[in-house]
UniProtKB/Swiss-Prot annotation:
Activity modulation comment: Inhibited by L-buthionine-S-sulfoximine (L-S-BSO).
Enzyme class (EC, first level): ligase
Organism: Streptococcus agalactiae serotype V (strain ATCC BAA-611 / 2603 V/R)
Family: In the N-terminal section; belongs to the glutamate--cysteine ligase type 1 family. Type 2 subfamily.
Annotated protein name in UniProt: Glutathione biosynthesis bifunctional protein GshAB
Database matches in NCBIfam families: glu_cys_lig_rel, PRK02471.1
PROSITE patterns attached to this UniProt entry: ATP_GRASP (PS50975)
Residue ranges constituting the ATP-grasp domain according to the UniProt record: 489-747
Assembly mode: Monomer.
Length: 750
């Protein structure tokens, strides 16, 4: 079977970049007040380690392992890792942060508690590692990079090879990649090594100078020297590994800490028949200059590097070559961070192969830029990660830098707690739900990002969610009924719930003729089936014919049918009902500022806009307050300008409408709202058959309990997909977390 020079013989349109990616990040939890390894147990907020697909513990209780799902491209893998890191950083105790370096801070054996896992084998395995290698070495952290070649790519190469058996071909291809990785991994150690020092008493021998990567040297986490596994063929590899376990040299196959692992089966013998499906590359130190420990550019450069390894011919003396390459890697790992690659390192072979891959397959200029960056780092070691890290070392210690950098990333995680890193372009309620999904260990897939459509599953239990709370729990007809204001009104009227008096019109002339019945009454004119307050005109006293006619025309521009209803005096509240229980109540107040007798209105607006919850284009729970034409007209009607200095305590209205989208305030009144109104809202949602419902009630005096006789509350609208984030992150009040309750209802077994 011919494996070498397959890429050279491939056509330029081969899907060479097609691959699947997975990243694993290890990080220690650090107790900020003491700046030592945290002694607290694994956070209960992170669900159960028995099944959590994204957040586990590695060797010790404080060492988190963050695991991305399989990603179809490198960008998605980085996106996953950003989100999982964000969730982990905000789920640990608030006085803890994740250590950004591979080498731990000062730590003693007694500070390291073995992960308290329920699986007896996993716990006993860690006890064995303690006896065999010691606890301290287990506290080193890193990044594991998983890559599987794309199926179309594998099929094309298989056909080109004219091999007889697809699994044998796939195994040989992955074995070649593994062999060449072990021959050339020293370049990655040079570029990305980031463990230059160990803190006091960590190593048995003392280092006099910083090095490039302790973790990737013989001083790092490696097997004992008597462990020898051949890479000559897959069969030799399997036999040697099985014999090492049988002889007691290894307690299990996974104790073999090779820089590259064959993956796809739990037992290595299965690879012979079922095939290797991907490889795990374990040589990456945490990059402390990235909040997630690795950068997009690194992931893509490594991908190009791996393709170059397929371009390079195999070795005819692989075990001997790997032995020599290991010595070279150790030399580079223990060299000074500003020392260039040694002369015996065949770096030109790698650079030429990477260049050939770029040219042969017409890769985008992005990959050429990545290669140029590699070339610059080869010429200038100070540009490598270890080279940049060198100036951060103080007295052969990185503790101060690690503490500072870890705190920066901790603060960054909490900077916008309503957003999920990596998914900021999605609707806020969906981001909040995804945070909870990752935190609790529910598997997820974004089926359609534009449509906010998610697939969630745990074991065989699958749920589909749209826009954060539209699920199978609601009958299909329910949102259709609530989207139609006339249908909603009729259903509520039949159940004797209070709704505004009014009528529906599909003809402009008929709507105009209705004026005689309402000309002396306060009214609201609105489209029949619209949202976000579009096309609505409010007349708090009464309307003249000209104004009424204009309001009709505005409403008809939004819908083919309109409603003319009585205007109800009072305060509007949004009630959030979930499965018959009102769990949140919100008061929305129009954009405003309150005078302090010192600042102008313009300055007061700027001060209020400093609230981190305020932003633009619905990317934050609250919108920035503008001072445009509408707001300035409103000020003029009150006798103010933007330069006026209102007296202390004077409330200045900047808008009439209370929409959050136009700078309004959200005020959580859940705990103070009279329970009779909560019950009323819940009963209205139940009457509609709604699992999730936003109920808008006008209440003249919320301090008085609701009475059916007095009907001192009126429902003006029901919403089938109510926003959730505005209940959680409010201008005032404690806020109510809704998405965790949605998730708990969907997956009660968790």
């Amino acid at each position: 079977m011919i494996i070498d020079r397959l890429l050279q013989r491939s056509h330029s349109h081969l899907p060479i970049l097609q691959a699947t990616f997975g990243l694993e990040r290890e990080s220690l939890r650090i107790h900020q007040p003491t700046q030592r390894v945290a002694q607290t147990p694994h956070p209960k907020t992170l669900g159960s380690r028995n099944y959590h697909p994204y957040i586990q513990t590695d060797y010790s209780e404080p060492q988190l392992e963050l695991i991305t799902p399989i990603a179809k491209d490198s960008q998605e893998a980085i996106r996953f890792l950003k989100a999982i890191s964000d969730v982990a950083g905000r789920s640990i105790n608030h006085d803890e942060y994740l250590w950004p370096l591979s080498m731990p801070p000062k730590v003693r054996e007694e500070d390291i508690q073995i992960a308290q896992l329920e699986d007896a084998f996993e716990y006993d395995y860690r006890k064995y590692l303690e006896k065999t290698y010691g606890k301290l070495i287990q506290s080193i952290s890193g990044i594991h990079y998983n890559l599987g070649l794309g199926q179309e790519l594998l099929t094309s190469l298989f056909e080109l090879s004219q091999a007889d058996n697809a699994i044998d071909f796939q195994n040989q291809l992955y074995m070649k990649l593994s062999q060449n990785f072990l021959r050339y991994r020293w370049l990655l150690t040079y570029l990305y090594g980031a463990s230059p020092v160990a803190e006091e008493d960590f190593l048995d021998q003392k280092l006099n100078n910083p090095v490039r990567s302790l973790r990737n040297s013989h001083l790092g986490y490696v097997n004992h020297k008597d462990i020898r596994i051949s890479y000559t063929s897959l069969k030799d590899y399997v036999n040697d590994l099985e014999n090492a376990v049988k002889s007691g040299q290894l307690i299990a196959e996974k104790e073999f800490y090779s820089p590259v692992r064959l993956r796809g089966s739990k037992a290595c013998r299965n690879y012979l028949e079922k095939g290797i499906t991907y490889l795990e590359f374990r040589t990456f130190d945490l990059n402390p200059f990235s909040p997630i420990g690795i950068t997009q550019e690194t992931v893509d450069t490594v991908h190009l590097f791996l393709l170059a390894l397929l371009w390079i011919d195999s070795s005819s003396h692989i075990d001997q070559d790997i032995k020599e390459a290991n010595r070279l890697n150790d030399l580079i790992a223990l060299s000074h961070p500003l020392e260039k690659l040694p002369n015996q390192a065949p770096v030109s072979d790698l650079v030429d192969a990477m260049q050939s891959v770029i040219q042969h397959f017409n890769l985008s200029p992005y990959y050429q830029d990545l290669l140029e960056s590699v070339k610059r780092q080869i010429q200038s070691p100070e540009l490598t990660v270890a080279g940049q890290l060198l100036e951060m070392i103080e007295g052969l210690s990185l503790e101060t830098f690690g503490q500072r950098q870890g705190q920066i990333y901790h603060d960054y995680a909490w900077e916008a707690p309503y957003a999920l890193k990596g998914y900021e372009t999605m609707e806020l309620s969906t981001q909040l739900l995804l945070f909870d999904v990752i935190q609790k260990g529910v598997n997820f897939e974004v089926l359609d990002e534009q449509d906010q459509f998610l697939k969630l599953w745990h074991n065989s239990h699958i749920e589909y969610v749209k826009n954060g709370n539209m699920t199978s729990k609601d009958n299909y007809i329910v949102p259709l009924a609530m989207a139609n204001k006339v249908v909603t009104k009729k259903i509520l009227d039949e159940k004797h719930f209070p709704t505004p008096f009014g009528d529906e019109f599909t003809d402009r002339k008929e709507a105009l003729n209705y004026f005689s019945q309402i000309q002396d009454k306060p009214i609201v004119v609105k489209p029949k089936s619209t949202n976000f307050g579009l096309g609505i005109s409010i007349f708090k006293t009464s309307a003249n014919l000209a104004s009424y006619e204009k309001a009709i025309d505005i409403a008809f521009t939004e819908d083919s049918a309109i409603l003319v209803e009585e205007y109800i005096e009072g305060t509007e509240y949004r009630f959030f009902v979930l499965e018959g229980d009102c769990i949140a109540v919100l008061l929305r107040v129009a954009a405003n500022v309150v005078g302090d007798g010192i600042h102008t209105i313009s300055q007061l607006v700027k001060l209020k806009n400093q609230n981190p919850l305020r932003g633009y284009d619905h990317r934050s729970p609250l919108e920035v307050i503008e001072l445009g034409e509408v707001e300035q007209l409103m000020l003029e009607q009150q006798g103010y300008t933007v330069n006026s200095i209102p007296p202390e305590g004077t409330k200045i209205e900047l808008r009439r409408n209370s929409n959050i989208s136009t700078g309004g305030d959200s005020i959580d009144v859940t705990n103070t709202m009279d329970p009779t109104y909560k019950q009323l809202a819940a009963e209205m949602a139940e009457a509609m058959g709604a699992w999730v419902c936003g109920v808008d009630l006008i209440i003249p005096n919320a301090t008085q309990a609701y009475s059916k006789d007095k009907k001192n509350a009126t429902c003006i609208e029901l919403n089938f997909n109510p926003l959730m984030y505005m209940h959680t992150y409010c201008q005032e009040g404690p806020g109510q977390s809704i998405t965790p309750r949605i998730l708990a209802k969907l997956f009660p077994e968790l």
